[in-house]
Amino acid sequence: HALEDWAETWAHYLLMHETLETAVEFEVIRPPETDREFHVWLSEWMQLVLVLNALNRSIGNADAYPFVVSTAVQKKLQFIHDLMHDI
């Protein structure tokens, strides 16, 4: 189901992108000085979700982001990230 995988990868990328933008707007993280390379962007994401998950756990809630970003998923997300930055 290639089209389903493509759509799910886009949805996941957009979720990550919008959450990072919201974190910048609320001054939870610093805005990027330049366009972020994928590995920097992903690292910022992973740091943010560690905090989000810890906050949720501290009040007895389930993880906000219970996913593992495998190497295969990273490659798919990087393709979309690069595509977005080439536009």
PLM region spans:
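Pan-zinc metallopeptidase signature
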Residues: 2-87
